[in-house]
Amino acid sequence: MTNEYHLPGIRVAERRIEVPLDWSAGTAAAGTIELLVRELVDPDRARDELPLLAFLQGGPGGSNPRPLRRDGWIDEALRDYRVVLVDQRGTGGSTPLEAVDVAGLDAAAGADLLALHRADSIVRDLEHVRETLYGGRRWATLGQSYGGFLTLTYLSMAPEALTACYVCGGIPGTPPRAAEVYARTFDRVAAKTAEMYRRFPADVEAIARIADRLAEGDVALPDGDVLTVRRFQSLGIDLGMKPGHERLHWLVEKAFARPGRLSEAFLADVQSLSSSAGNPLFWTLQESIYGDPASGPTAWAAQTERDRRPVFDESRRPLMFTGEMAFPWMFDEVRLLRGFRDAVHALAERADWTPLYDLDRLAANDVPLAAAVYFDDMDVDAGLQLETLAAPL
């Protein structure tokens, strides 16, 4: 059944399709999940035989954009393509994976379930959509951030499906090594924090006052979670986006309602920014995207790197922020992540990863690939991206 409707300048068609939860086991053994497939097309060209462009959303754990109107990259793409948005398994309108689904499992079973939501399964889902709904027509892909990781997995598994690949800020190191990623990205986060303090010098003292108050240990968010200094530091993930510096500055401005008392507006905003309500898989799967047989366990690589850097200590002033880095404390302190705790710890210890990249196949790649690398990317290190692109691909 197709659900069709119109947005300003866009004709939308939605369909749902079942896929195996575990592609290696098949439907009978593991059951199925549902994917939401949303197709966008220029209303004036709805009957035209347009080429297909599959958008690969950033993440991990990110669902596709919900357009309000025809603008941005979608406007440009609709000039030439029929755009296909497949909500990745576990996200958006596809069968969700939430903490409650994992909390009742033992740690090993929970880790196995999480691992079924990595890039290899996502690519198999996309191939099923392409074969089933589009008659096996080849398509181009546009990958944003983590979507670039998916792109290289796709080129490793099914390059024959692809006419061209476009990537924005998302070429992984190959083979992926979590420790190497964080050794580089902590430097970028430190630089972004320093840049914020240069732009807003009064925030050095204002943020120190917030951290000092949180260090007393009795500040609760509206949902009852205790707001710790390290959870406040994690808001630095926004420094990797524009206008992240400005957003964080304006958040800090409204921190105190009275001397010593943090405002309800500030606490509500911090909860919204750090609760993972909209995307619990982002932190849960964060390090698993670097899991590879050549690299061994990810072993909480971000926490290990942070422990090597006293400048990020909660007691240091000026206070440093952290970025796109998952830490074990999140699964104790953040209410909506607690159900994942045992499973994500088991996942961090996993060594027998399914490989996501076929380096020989990538070296022989003949699918056109164009990548935009952001020179000061805080989350996907530009140096690692360029090293991968410099290799035969």
Q: Model segments located where?
A:
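Gly/Pro-rich cap/lid or specificity-loop segments adjacent to the active site
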Residues: 2-223, 336-341, 354-361, 367, ...
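Alpha/beta-hydrolase fold active-site neighborhood
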Residues: 218-350
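Short, proline-enriched alpha-helix->beta-strand connector loops that line the catalytic pocket
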Residues: 230, 363-369, 391-392
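Short alpha-helix in the alpha/beta-hydrolase fold that links the catalytic acid
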Residues: 251-253, 381-390
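Hydrophobic alpha-helical segments
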Residues: 372, 378-379, 391-392
